[in-house]
Regions:
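A short, flexible beta-alpha/helix-coil linker loop
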Residues: 32-35, 68-69, 100-101, 147-148
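N-terminal, helix-rich and Lys/Arg-enriched segments in bacterial and organellar proteins
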Residues: 6, 28-35, 51, 137-139, ...
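Glycine-centered flexibility sites
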Residues: 30, 46, 63-68, 98, ...
Length: 259
């Protein structure tokens, strides 16, 4: 009898270990454009809040993004430490920062948020990559979604694409360029959501974008439909990179846009 109980116990332990090994976990870190929000308190929704809907049940999305955080403040406040404490070997970490790094116009801000692109911002991106890998995780850069800064010709302005530089050929204050540079140097996959969201809203048009994608009074944050659309773009970006491809759902009945 004792032997039977031991066999059942061993089987349960083995099953638990097997299920745990099959589980895929995706950690997302970033700012308010990615964060979760309390329903019925605001129209704002972050795309990270919708991200789980685009994966099969084998994948768990854990969203750590918080409003007002930059690459610097997220790290310095101890939020990154909480992510690391929960990180397991093989986990994915999606890293998206820039909106609040820009707060001081490309300088290191006294409030701990603003970062100079090619020095402070770059160094924090490198920290996230290095520390993720040291724990057996897989870092992925996600360039920031565009701000709803339309120009007269119907395109999103350079500033809306997180390039604060004055001259067109100047990359001194181009946060997306810095992220891509670090990605190349550290061999990190990049999902270019700056490009994909830019193309998306330019094709949709300014009027529909204001009504359906972003909070109408806000050029930075998305409402529910916009967050869902952007989450889908993020999932598509991963699929194109052959990352988590077999776990990504298609034709998710979540989005309804009037074009």
């Amino acid at each position: 009898m004792k032997r039977k109980y031991w066999s059942l116990g061993a089987l349960w332990i083995y099953s638990t270990i097997l299920l745990s090994a099959q589980e895929v976990r995706v950690h997302t870190i970033g700012d308010s454009t990615m964060a979760d929000y309390v329903e019925n308190t605001t129209r704002t929704r972050g795309w990270g809040e919708m991200f789980q809907e685009f994966f099969y049940p084998e994948v768990e999305v854990i969203n750590y993004a918080r409003g007002g955080r930059s690459s610097r403040s997220f790290y310095q406040e101890g939020r990154w430490e909480k992510v690391k404490n929960n990180l397991r070997k093989g986990d994915y970490v999606l890293i998206q920062f820039a909106h609040n790094d820009e707060k001081e116009g490309g300088k290191d801000g006294a409030d701990g948020r603003g970062t100079a692109p090619w020095t402070t911002y770059k160094s924090y991106l490198e920290k996230y990559v290095d520390e993720t890998r040291s724990l057996g995780g897989k870092p992925i850069f996600v360039t920031p979604i565009v701000r709803r800064y339309f120009q007269k010709d119907g395109t999103i302005s350079p500033k809306g694409c997180h390039d604060l530089s004055i001259a067109p050929d100047d990359s001194t204050l181009n946060y997306v360029r810095v992220m891509k540079y670090v990605a190349q140097e550290w061999h990190v996959p990049v999902v270019d959501m700056t490009a994909s969201t830019k193309a998306f809203v330019e094709q949709l048009g300014e009027t529909a974008t204001v009504k359906q994608i972003y909070v109408p009074t806000d050029g930075t944050h998305t409402q529910a439909t916009g967050a869902a659309c952007y989450a889908e773009l993020a999932a598509e970006g991963l699929r194109e990179k052959d990352i988590l491809k077999k776990y990504i759902r298609t034709n998710v009945p979540l989005i309804s846009i009037v074009r």
